[in-house]
Every structure is written in C-alpha cells, then in structure tokens.
C-alpha cells in the first residue's frame, strides 16, 4: 500500500547503507581463506580445460570460451533451431542439464546453449562422457 512505502524504504536502508557487523567480520575472514580459494580456483581451471576440449569432442564445436564465469556458451545453430527443445532432449537422453539460450537472449537464444562447469571435476568428466554418447547416438539416429 502507498502509505507503507516510506516506512519500508526506511527499514530497507538499514540493510543497504551498512552491512551488519557480523557480516563484515565474516567477509574479512573469507579473505583469509587463501588456501581454500586457491584449491577452488584450480578445480574451476581444470573443469574449464575439460569443457573446452570435451565439448568439441562431443560435437559442440562453436563455443565461446568463458571469460570471468563458469559457463561455456555454445552456438548450436548447426544442430537445432530450438534450444529449449534441444536442452530438454539432452536432459532426457543424456541426463545432463544445460540451459537454453532463450533464458538470456530472446532474439538469438534459440541458437545457443549454456553449459556450466560449477560442479566437481568428476561430475564434469561424467557429463562430457554422457554428452559424447548422446551426440553420437543422435547423429546415427
């Protein structure tokens, strides 16, 4: 209701102007976790390497190398004109969840899929194996 807007704004300002003291202490402690952060960085680097080699081996040859996040975008216009249906087909046939490009681009998204490598390295290797098997069967079928 309009008469509550200013009251809610005042309450919300307390969350945005300055984070609570406990959150500030936790953030400082997180900056001291150098070994853990480096271990995570190494996992992401290995997962990225696996994706950049494994996706083309599976048939996804038009990929945009990730630069700042743990996602690989693949142009699948040579494989489909419906990324939503293709993502569902991959989930059903390979048991691998990918995201249709329409979630990010309403104009050209039907031609793109997004692959995440924010999982364990074993999960990434298994997912790529499943994608290879699925795509080989799809090409033969």
Walk through the language-model features, giving the residues of each.
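PLP-dependent class I/II
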Residues: 1-141
């Amino acid at each position: 209701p309009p008469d509550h807007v200013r009251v809610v704004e005042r309450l919300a300002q307390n969350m945005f102007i300055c984070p609570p003291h406990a959150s500030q202490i936790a953030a400082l402690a997180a900056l001291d976790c150098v070994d853990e952060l480096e271990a995570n960085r190494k996992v992401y680097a290995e997962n990225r390497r696996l994706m950049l080699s494994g996706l083309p081996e599976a048939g996804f040859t038009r990929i945009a190398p990730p630069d700042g996040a743990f996602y690989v975008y693949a142009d699948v216009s040579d494989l489909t004109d419906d990324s939503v249906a293709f993502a569902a087909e991959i989930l059903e046939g390979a048991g691998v969840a990918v995201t249709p490009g329409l979630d990010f681009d309403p104009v050209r998204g039907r031609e793109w899929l997004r692959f995440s490598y924010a999982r364990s390295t074993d999960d990434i290797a298994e997912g790529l194996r499943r994608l290879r098997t699925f795509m080989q069967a799809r090409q033969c079928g």
